[in-house]
């Protein structure tokens, strides 16, 4: 476990600062399986999780939904047969906040015990 998966999200307002380049370089090392994607001019963190079937993929999606609700920070989720794509970014600041890295780490923790992972 790392410090990120033990942390909790803080309220993120529209005027909250995005992570700096230095923070980005440090934080991304703590979530090595995630990719930075640029969409609509802003950075997002994305990872694809593979499962044996749709039932397991849906259960994982619901588990991520539970932690998202608990933290008040919500990802993009695409659930397909045997696959879930999870995308974290801070909508209010149109970019990456420390909260997104926390939620990536928390997602990784859920994935470790998710049934039906490939």
Swiss-Prot record:
Family: Belongs to the pterin-4-alpha-carbinolamine dehydratase family.
Record-level Gene Ontology MF annotations: 4-alpha-hydroxytetrahydrobiopterin dehydratase activity
UniProt keyword annotation of Lyase present: yes
The name this protein goes by in its record: Putative pterin-4-alpha-carbinolamine dehydratase
Keyword Lyase: yes
GO annotation terms (biological process): tetrahydrobiopterin biosynthetic process
InterPro entries per the UniProt record, alphabetical: PCD_sf (IPR036428), Pterin-4-alpha-carb_dehyd (IPR050376), Pterin_deHydtase (IPR001533)
Alphabetical keyword list: Lyase
Gene3D superfamilies for the chain: Transcriptional coactivator/pterin dehydratase (3.30.1360.20)
PANTHER family hit by this protein: PTERIN-4-ALPHA-CARBINOLAMINE DEHYDRATASE-RELATED (PTHR42805:SF1)
């Amino acid at each position: 476990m790392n410090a990120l998966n033990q942390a909790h999200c803080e309220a993120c307002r529209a005027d909250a600062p995005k992570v700096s380049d230095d923070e980005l370089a440090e934080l991304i090392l703590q979530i090595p399986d995630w990719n930075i994607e640029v969409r609509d001019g802003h950075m997002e963190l994305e990872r694809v999780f593979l499962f044996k079937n749709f039932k397991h993929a849906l259960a994982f999606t619901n588990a991520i939904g539970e932690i998202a609700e608990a933290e008040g920070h919500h990802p993009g989720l695409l659930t397909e047969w045997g696959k879930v794509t999870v995308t974290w970014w801070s909508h209010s600041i149109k970019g990456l906040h420390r909260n997104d890295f926390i939620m990536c780490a928390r997602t990784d923790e859920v994935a470790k015990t998710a049934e039906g992972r490939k």
